[in-house]
UniProtKB/Swiss-Prot annotation:
FYVE-type Zn finger ranges: 1-58
InterPro entries: Bbox1_ANCHR, Znf_FYVE, Znf_FYVE-rel, Znf_FYVE_PHD, Znf_RING/FYVE/PHD
Disordered: region residues: 158-177, 204-227
Protein name, per record: Abscission/NoCut checkpoint regulator
Motif (MIM1-B): 252-265
Subunit structure as annotated in this protein's UniProt entry: Interacts (via MIM1-B) with VPS4A; interaction takes place at the midbody ring following cytokinesis checkpoint activation.
Record lineage: Eukaryota, Metazoa, Chordata, Craniata, Vertebrata
Native species: Mus musculus (Mouse)
Result, substituting P164L: In strain: FVB/N
Residue sites binding Zn(2+) 2 per the record: C21, C24, C50, C53
Length: 389
């Protein structure tokens, strides 16, 4: 069962909290427990009590029976009910038990079939007028309700927080923004120029105005001279860079023609458009190295594809196997004939370890039982340089 106020029967909620009367101990809301009195149970201290306990504690109990007598309407209803019971008991005394049960059922049916009292039009209008005349408190606004809820939750009320100012997005294009910035800078320069005559006027009022004028003339001459020197310096740097660029292009073209001659191509058909020219910011050595790398890669591709490679003359001496045998290892990195772990002379090659060389002891120690069974080995004999006869 939901807990309700003993005085107004309202439910206890978050906003309607439950309080207890210090005298009678019943549960009341804050509105019904608005009286204060000295309570003997609490050591004759001022406590919150209900209206009934406040009346008893302040005025004292009265022995007058008329004060506690029920209303007159209640007395009349009780008297009519007692008279009806007496008449029914006197009438039912002459009936049997079955007849009394039937009579009670008939009386109950008659009570149920009686038409209920319908209020008249005047009563309904009076009740509506009374409801309209009731004084209603002001309805709190949304802002007040949000502030109260924030206070209950322990937060800062929204009305006290500073809201950030709304800044509209900039819908201007980049060209418009640049133009506006230039206009702003022009206006600032104009303001600065307007402020300069005041300073010159203050200098004219000085007794040493002749010296000030000469100093200003000298400073202007020095500024113009420095601008001229800077202009000539920039022109000289541009000429040097242009000359370096031309020299670099000529060197790249010469290298490309030499490579074309080595390939057996016509060097007159080689142009700078066939190669990626370096940027002007690159160093000359870096650019040459990059172009050389590009040309070398192209030559390697041509050699791999067999395009435009001259045929090698067939050797006729007996030393051909030895030379062919020496060209392969010397073209690539020469293999070192010792163990890859202890640098002792290698005796076998392990195919399961990407062809690494081992001595017998390091091979046993570096392989477990599974590797010894799975890895295939072959004896290794270091290559010796052949002698021509």
């Amino acid at each position: 069962m939901e807990s309700r106020c003993y005085g107004c029967a309202v439910k206890f909620t978050l906003f309607k909290k439950e309080y207890g009367c210090k005298n009678c101990g019943r549960a009341f809301c804050n509105g019904c427990l608005s009286f204060s009195a000295l309570v003997p149970r609490a050591g004759n201290t001022q406590q919150k009590v209900c209206k009934q306990c406040h009346t008893i504690l302040t005025r004292g109990s009265s022995d007058n029976a008329s004060k506690w007598s029920p209303p007159q309407n209640y007395k009349k209803r009780v008297a009519a009910l007692e008279a009806k019971k007496k008449s029914s008991t006197s009438h039912s005394q002459s009936l049997t038990h079955k007849d009394q049960a039937i009579a009670e059922r008939l009386a109950r049916l008659r009570q149920e079939n009686k038409p209920k009292s319908v209020p008249s039009q005047a009563e309904i209008e009076a009740r509506l007028a009374a409801l309209k005349d009731e004084v209603q408190g002001p309805i709190p606004s949304t802002q007040e309700m949000e502030d109260r809820l924030a206070a209950l939750q322990g937060r800062v009320p929204p009305s006290h927080t500073v809201r950030p100012a709304h800044q509209a997005p900039d819908t201007r294009t980049q060209a418009q923004q640049t133009q506006d910035l230039l206009t702003q800078l022009t206006a600032e320069v104009a303001i600065d120029e307007n402020c300069q005559p005041r300073a010159s006027a203050s200098l004219q009022n000085d007794l040493n105005k002749g010296a000030a004028r000469s100093q200003r003339t000298n400073s202007q001459g020095q500024a113009s001279q420095s601008l001229e020197e800077e202009k000539y310096k920039l022109l000289a740097e541009a000429a040097v860079e242009l000359q370096e660029e031309n020299t670099r292009q000529e060197r790249i073209l010469a290298l490309a023609k030499r490579l074309a001659v080595l390939k057996g191509q016509d060097p007159s058909r080689v142009t700078l458009q066939d190669y990626h020219l370096p940027d002007s910011d690159e160093d000359e050595e870096t650019a040459i190295q990059r172009v050389m790398q590009q040309l070398t890669e192209e030559a390697a591709l041509d050699e791999a594809s067999g395009f435009n490679i001259p045929e090698k003359p067939a050797p006729g001496s007996r030393a051909q196997p030895c030379k062919a045998e020496m060209e392969g290892p010397q073209a690539e990195e020469e293999e070192l004939p010792w163990c890859c772990i202890c640098n002792e002379d290698a005796t076998l090659r392990c195919a399961g370890c990407d062809g690494d060389l081992y001595c017998a002891r390091c091979f046993r120690e570096g392989h477990d039982n599974f590797d010894l069974k799975e890895h295939q080995t072959s004896p290794y004999h270091p290559r010796r340089p052949c002698q021509e006869h």
